[in-house]
From Swiss-Prot:
This is Translational regulator CsrA. It comes from Geobacillus sp. (strain WCH70). InterPro entries: CsrA, CsrA_sf. GO terms for molecular function: mRNA 5'-UTR binding. A translational regulator that binds mRNA to regulate translation initiation and/or mRNA stability. Usually binds in the 5'-UTR at or near the Shine-Dalgarno sequence preventing ribosome-binding, thus repressing translation. Its main target seems to be the major flagellin gene, while its function is anatagonized by FliW. GO terms for biological process: bacterial-type flagellum organization; mRNA catabolic process; negative regulation of translational initiation; regulation of bacterial-type flagellum assembly; regulation of carbohydrate metabolic process. It is found in: Cytoplasm. Its main location: cytoplasm. Belongs to the CsrA/RsmA family. The lineage of its organism: Bacteria, Bacillati, Bacillota, Bacilli, Bacillales. Keywords: Bacterial flagellum biogenesis, Cytoplasm, Repressor, RNA-binding, Translation regulation.
């Protein structure tokens, strides 16, 4: 992990396209401004983890739904052929 010290209004550059600016420091909080291209997703860690959990849950639900649909189709085909 790279650790940097910055003062108010100072900037960290990441690659060619991303800038992080220290906008304010109040007590134990630091306010950051982030300039990045629109295609770069930026989230707080807790939001990112919540999104990942939702995506995983949706993926599992979709798989279960598809498996149930497949079973129903098998029964339907079996009833038609008999």
């Amino acid at each position: 992990m790279l650790v940097l010290t910055r003062k108010l209004k100072e900037v960290i550059q990441i690659g060619d396209d991303i800038e992080i600016t220290v906008l304010a420091i109040q007590g134990d909080q630091v306010k950051l401004g982030i300039n990045a291209p629109k295609h770069v997703e930026i989230h707080r860690k807790e939001i990112y983890l919540a999104i990942q959990a939702e995506n995983n849950a949706a993926s599992l639900a979709s798989k279960t739904s598809l498996e149930q649909l497949n079973e129903q189709l098998k029964h339907w085909k079996g009833g038609k052929q008999a």
